[in-house]
């Protein structure tokens, strides 16, 4: 259990659901909700506090709009930013959200210099690099939540296709948090059997299509905003892995230094987490086609990085 965590963007859909799930699972003794919309932020904090009281969970949840109050937070979760709307690509969000992440990261480094940073804002992989550079934190302490979500969508779609929600499934979707994500069907398991032995080639194509379209489908249903229950759950999964040292392999956006032949960008890869953040990146054996697809997956991120450099949001 953490002593204190802070959620920047705590009044938004993702931030408030992280707080609610975190309270219900008693992830911390104190959860701080930071937002410019202080009335809503305080309302969310009070509402969740009353929910926690129903289950007699001893937790302090409060809203604030001063960075000074995030001092001594062990983890700071960044959900702030503009959400995707119908027909909006992640690139459309790039410059809009990068300036927000720049400001937040600089303030977190000033007020909570020992914290871990978990980034949820999109475009995820590029925002992680912005957060790392402007916080000046070690690469292990800046983690992006996306691969857990993409992998969960593959797990869900495979259960739908099998018509059996009782199956134990382990899925890995690596690469960028975009349409270029790479579901590693050869490494995904259902009751110990690999997906490529269970699903026909046509079924595999359908699984990949549905997984990649999972987020956009929710955006189209909601019309205003994007997914928040599942992303919030992904953050809690990271927090629990850090606090319990459960050794579970999770796909998160992490800084690369040659792993999988990729350097100097954030990318969704399998990792193990510990008290100090990323302990190590797990390198699954890829065949030539998978490696080529992973390389393609990095191109969009690299293009975003160049755009951010041109606009002085990265250096």
UniProtKB/Swiss-Prot annotation:
Q: Which InterPro entries match?
A: L-lactate/malate_DH (IPR001557), Lactate/malate_DH_C (IPR022383), Lactate/malate_DH_N (IPR001236), Lactate_DH/Glyco_Ohase_4_C (IPR015955), Malate_DH_type3 (IPR011275), NAD(P)-bd_dom_sf (IPR036291)
Which GO molecular function entries does the Swiss-Prot or TrEMBL record give? L-lactate dehydrogenase activity; L-malate dehydrogenase (NAD+) activity
Q: Which E.C. number(s) belong to this protein?
A: 1.1.1.37
- Which keywords appear in this protein's UniProt record, sorted alphabetically? NAD, Oxidoreductase, Tricarboxylic acid cycle
Name one process (GO BP) from the record: tricarboxylic acid cycle
For substrate, which residues are the binding ones? 84, 90, 122, 153
Q: So where's the catalytic machinery, residue-wise?
A: 177
Positions that bind NAD(+): 9-15, 97, 120-122
The answer to whether UniProt assigns keyword Repeat to this entry is no
NAD among the record's keywords? yes
Query: Reaction catalysed?
Result: (S)-malate + NAD(+) = oxaloacetate + NADH + H(+)
Q: What does this protein do?
A: Catalyzes the reversible oxidation of malate to oxaloacetate.
Family per similarity comment: Belongs to the LDH/MDH superfamily.
- This chain belongs to the protein called Malate dehydrogenase
